[in-house]
Amino acid sequence: MGTTEATLRMENVDVRDEWQDEDLPRPLPEDTGEDHLGGTVEDSSSPPSTLNLSGAHRKRKTLVAPEINISLDQSEGSLLSDDFLDTPDDLDINVDDIETPDETDSLEFLGNGNELEWEDDTPVATAKNMPGDSADLFGDGSGEDGSAANGRLWRTVIIGEQEHRIDLHMIRPYMKVVTHGGYYGEGLNAIIVFAACFLPDSSSPDYHYIMENLFLYVISSLELLVAEDYMIVYLNGATPRRRMPGIGWLKKCYHMIDRRLRKNLKSLIIVHPSWFIRTVLAISRPFISVKFISKIQYVHSLEELEQLIPMEHVQLPACVLQYEEQRLRAKRESARPPQPEFLLPRSEEKPETVEEEDRAAEVTEDQETSMS
């Protein structure tokens, strides 16, 4: 009796959940005419033989995925619509909390590449100071064993809104031509020392090429060293004629200097001026402004220079110091009174006087004898 009532109750239940006993979906019992208990509808009055009423089977529900419109527009259901842009709270990123790299972190990857360019595909290991390798500061690739790479180190500078490249390998022996001599007065008034004795010899085979790159190096160094007003100390002493810069080179330097640098130049001190440098400046007057000519000052000794500027940080070449010492020695010798070349001792003067008196006495006696 109990089994019959349970069967009647189950007939009144509309079960639309699908049993997930198989991988593929199957039609519902009402569509095929089969009962949900495994028998046909006509055989529903018979008691079930396979249904376990004591235990409950766990049923799984089929989740149907929503229809997705795979398109690039932002219409409803599209991948780009706002319905699919919701993200959990733990995925929200605060931009202010993101750490950005500072200048020191970025420079670790740049190295010297921000201003140096390599030619002929030089390997990176030869350009950087790797641990255990010898330092190659000028990019000539020479190491401790004397070997050299094919590449050269170049520096790119901008002068007068134009980009130029400097061959640092060629001007390496002449880089001491421009040095920083400290500051004078109040503020950042720089002292730029130009030592002409470090200029290349005009008899060099690559003289014009070296002077061209050295000129760019001097101009770019001025722009880096000068912040406010400045003065140039031109050390002309101990410079042979073959190392003197030509008029064309000086003229080019003057015209390539930025207007700000020409305006901020307060004085051009020429130490140990020679007749040649005076002649060059006299010939250059037509293309040099009167204001620039008025800034030129001649100094004939280092002692006089010390009275004009502080000398604590001025690096004087050894040849200039030697030239100054020779000039001081020659000046002291010229200041001494002239001395006679031959001096007779007084002991020898007395016998000569006696002999002259004896001769005079003999002549007098002869005259008296003849008169008698």
From Swiss-Prot:
Keywords: Cell projection, Cytoplasm, Mitochondrion, Neurogenesis, Phosphoprotein, Synapse, Transport, Ubl conjugation
Disease linked to the protein: Defects in Atcay are the cause of primary generalized dystonia. The dt (SD-dt:JFL) rat is a spontaneous mutant that develops a dystonic motor syndrome by P12. Dystonic rats exhibit both axial and appendicular dystonia that progresses in severity with increasing postnatal age. There are no gross differences between normal and dt rats in terms of brain morphology.
InterPro entries: Bcl2-/adenovirus-E1B, CRAL-TRIO_dom, CRAL-TRIO_dom_sf
Protein's GO biological process: apoptotic process; mitochondrion distribution; negative regulation of glutamate metabolic process; neuron projection development; regulation of protein localization
PROSITE patterns from the UniProt entry: CRAL_TRIO
One Pfam family linked to the record: CRAL_TRIO_2
Role: Functions in the development of neural tissues, particularly the postnatal maturation of the cerebellar cortex. May play a role in neurotransmission through regulation of glutaminase/GLS, an enzyme responsible for the production in neurons of the glutamate neurotransmitter. Alternatively, may regulate the localization of mitochondria within axons and dendrites.
Span list, region Required for interaction with KLC1: 115-120
Domain comment, as recorded: The CRAL-TRIO domain is known to bind small hydrophobic molecules.
Annotated GO MF terms: kinesin binding
Stretches assigned to the CRAL-TRIO domain: 171-328
Top-level taxon in the UniProt lineage: Eukaryota
Tissue spec. comment: Specifically expressed in brain. Detected in cerebellum (at protein level).
Residue numbers spanned by region Disordered: 1-58, 125-144, 330-372
Biased composition annotated in UniProt, kind: Polar residues: 42-53
Modified how: Cleaved by CASP3 and CASP7. The potential C-terminal product released by CASP3 cleavage may inhibit the ERK signaling pathway through MAP2K2. May be ubiquitinated by STUB1.
Gene encoding the protein: Atcay
Gene3D superfamilies, per database record: CRAL-TRIO lipid binding domain (3.40.525.10)
Site residues, Cleavage: 105-106
Acidic residues composition bias: residue spans: 354-372
Descriptive protein name: Caytaxin
Region described as Mediates interaction with GLS: spans on this chain: 190-372
Subunit relationships: Interacts with KLC1; may link mitochondria to KLC1 and regulate mitochondria localization into neuron projections. Interacts with GLS; the interaction is direct and may control GLS localization, negatively regulating its activity. Interacts with PIN1; upon NGF stimulation. The interaction with PIN1 (via WW domain) and GLS is competitive.
